[in-house]
Amino acid sequence: YTYKIKEGIKWDDGTPLTAEDVEYSVKIMLCPLTNNTQIRSNYSTVIKSIELFPNDPLKFTMYAQKLHVDNKYIFSELYIQQKDYWDPERILDKISFENLMSKDFDKKIVTEKLSDYFNEFNKDDNSYQPEKLLGLGAYQVTEWEKGQYIIIERKEDWWGKFDLSIYNTSFPDKIIFKIITDKVSVELALKNQTIDVSTAIDTKTLMDLQKREDFNQNYTSGFIDRYAYSYLGMNTKPDGIERKKFFVDKNVRRAIAYTIP
């Protein structure tokens, strides 16, 4: 799968986004030393390697592990990071994709320098300090109070501000994301109009709110389809020691099924 990056996309320091940034970001996602166990398989099961084009810094080819209809969309989920900022010494340049996928990575590939690099890269501060949250979007994180709120502000010199596409248009100067952890507080905030938008409302709460005239006057609300599904998995082959064998009884499985709306 060969891609061509749109021209004119720039990092906050004015340097252009290149295919090397993409290659670096993929290596970060695939490397076993990165603290991303939960999502690494999203990429390692799809991406085999990245090939750059020396004569075109915006072009690259992704070789997939196997043929699949969704392979070409993998980069829509990739967190692209600035190589010059995170790897100025080009440490990952010395690590091939074959090395990253090697079963002997920990024994044969990892060096003290590489280990030190990832110990620094994986520090918690890199995930929360606004000055280190570098991106290509229209907004910059300016304040993050853990468990309370996140503030993002519009970049004045953003590369896409003259693009008329609706996807590249940013309106508010500042957006505050309030972290509300329970549905009762969300409902109360909507009733008191202390928030402008929420997607964290359960079905019953929204249906109750839609019965209120003041809510309908101040908010536009509705139910939308999601590209997702929910399921209940039953372990029908437990070991009988740590997991009891009660799901082997079809009547138990049937009873559980009756509890699902």
Annotate each predicted stretch with a short phrase.
Residues 4, 40-116, 145:
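Surface-exposed binding/hinge segments that line
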Residues 31, 80, 87, 119, ...:
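Generic surface-pattern signal
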Residues 113-132:
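Intrinsically disordered, low-complexity acidic Ser/Thr-rich regulatory segments
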Residues 2-38, 49-53, 67, 127-132, ...:
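Extracytoplasmic/periplasmic ligand-capture domains
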